[in-house]
Amino acid sequence: MIFVKIGIASDHRGYKAKQILKDNLYKYEVIDYGTDSEDSVDFPVYAKKLGFAIQNGEVDLGIAICGTGIGMSIALNKMKGIYCAKVSNVSEAVLCKSHNNANVIAMSEDLSEDDMLKIVEKFINTPFSNVIKYVRRNNMVSELEND
């Protein structure tokens, strides 16, 4: 097992799923960046908190949950140094980390508890492959932040 600090954030639709994940990620240090209830909120507020935590080194990896995972993913990917993949299955969780070196995953609250837990475990424990073509491509993506 790799020791990492995990940041987790959700909007109101992802709140219940976030709580389930927190309860099951006891092997890791998990920091919750909100929201704290099912009251309606604006997802960019919580995406930004999670993104800042990664940028500042408070956490190593992030998990974002909203209705579809799309909104959180879009918001997080606007932030420099954040590489968020919207994932729906274990294969995507593995590939986003091993090929793209993603540091955040965004998921839909509609996923089953079992699927979410499998996705998160694979994301956390999959290393970046360091294959030359993936390093080159990831460097090209990083350069886009300067355009």
What annotation goes with each model-predicted range?
Residues 2-6:
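Extreme N-terminal starter segment of soluble prokaryotic enzymes
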Residues 9, 13-16, 90-147:
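C-terminal binding/interaction regions
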Residues 13-26:
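Short, solvent-exposed amphipathic alpha-helices that sit
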Residues 17, 38-40, 59:
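Membrane-interface helix-loop junctions in multi-pass transporters/channels
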Residues 26, 79-80, 100:
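Short, structured coil segments at secondary-structure junctions
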Residues 29-32, 82-89:
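Short hydrophobic/aromatic-enriched beta-strand-loop microsegments
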Residues 29-41:
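A short beta-strand-loop structural module common to alpha/beta enzyme folds
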Residues 46, 50-86:
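Helix-adjacent hinge/juxtasegments
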